[in-house]
């Protein structure tokens, strides 16, 4: 009796075959091609952050959310006055951009504050202010990572630029492609080796973690914007600006600087 073969063909399983009893298909040869599924919504039935009864942007004072914002995805508070999420493809793209920018902003905000915090507590490692640190590469001695010459000693801005392009490009390509074998279904939440703490093991808890990530990420993006403005206006790091404000809140605040700010000075 001849046997039938069902060949599962995909980027992850290319070349593998699964034998199927002939009683199911007779003499037929069935070929099935596996494609990456779209990311599933993170709706959580018991969470206040999802579904039609979720928390909205103004609480009980919120108006009726747009029909296309159904509470399926994390961070949906029913607010879209500009209609940016009306088109499903644009909505999916913007969701991905927001999550990626949120993660970079959280890392960036920590990187802006932590070196300055260490320097203010006596740790010596060169320039601690985030927007001044990179310029040390143009100094005669170059740039020592963490102020330690035994770590990475950089002297060429072109070499750093090339490393950034190659390394970050490779990481982003790895993410978009779903890993080396294309086995990752959702590039935003790949799981597996990218989740060593097992945060995604419990679907209910994972749905809430996604909301927390976006909340903190949105705050981090606003923080980074504030750090940029502070750097342009005051020429100081975020912690030094905070210390100045606490020491003299009347003369060191956004209003005082806005009314006295002269570009280029």
Curated annotation (Swiss-Prot):
This is Chlorophyll a-b binding protein M9, chloroplastic. The keyword Metal-binding applies. It is a multi-pass membrane protein. Chlorophyll a 2 binds at residue 101. The modification N2-acetylarginine is found at residue 33. Chlorophyll b 2 binds at residues 103, 152, 181. Belongs to the light-harvesting chlorophyll a/b-binding (LHC) protein family. Chlorophyll a 5 binds at residues 212, 230. GO terms for cellular component: chloroplast thylakoid membrane; photosystem I; photosystem II. GO terms for molecular function: chlorophyll binding; metal ion binding. The modification Phosphothreonine is found at residue 35.
């Amino acid at each position: 009796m001849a046997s039938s073969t069902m060949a599962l063909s995909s980027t992850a399983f290319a070349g593998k075959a699964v034998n199927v009893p002939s009683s199911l298909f007779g003499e037929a040869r069935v070929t099935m091609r596996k494609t990456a599924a779209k990311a599933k919504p993170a709706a959580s039935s018991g969470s206040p952050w999802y579904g039609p009864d979720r928390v909205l942007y103004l609480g009980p004072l919120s108006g009726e959310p747009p029909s296309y914002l159904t509470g399926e995805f994390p961070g949906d508070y029913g607010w879209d006055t500009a209609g940016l999420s009306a088109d499903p493809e644009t909505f999916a793209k913007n969701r991905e951009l927001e999550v990626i920018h949120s993660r970079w902003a959280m890392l960036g905000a920590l990187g802006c504050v932590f070196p300055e915090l260490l320097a203010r507590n006596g740790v010596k490692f060169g320039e601690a202010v985030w927007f001044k640190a990179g310029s040390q590469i143009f100094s005669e001695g170059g740039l020592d990572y963490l102020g330690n010459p035994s770590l990475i000693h950089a002297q060429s801005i072109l070499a750093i630029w090339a490393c950034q392009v190659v390394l970050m490009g490779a990481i982003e390509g790895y993410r978009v492609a779903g890993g080396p074998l294309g086995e990752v279904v959702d590039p935003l939440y790949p799981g597996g080796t990218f989740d060593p703490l097992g945060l995604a093991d419990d679907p209910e808890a994972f749905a809430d973690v996604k909301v927390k990530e976006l909340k903190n990420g949105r705050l981090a993006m606003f923080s980074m914007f504030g750090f940029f403005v502070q750097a342009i206006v005051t020429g100081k790091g975020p912690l030094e600006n905070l210390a100045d404000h606490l020491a003299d809140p009347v003369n060191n605040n956004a209003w005082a600087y806005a009314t006295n700010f002269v570009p280029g000075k």
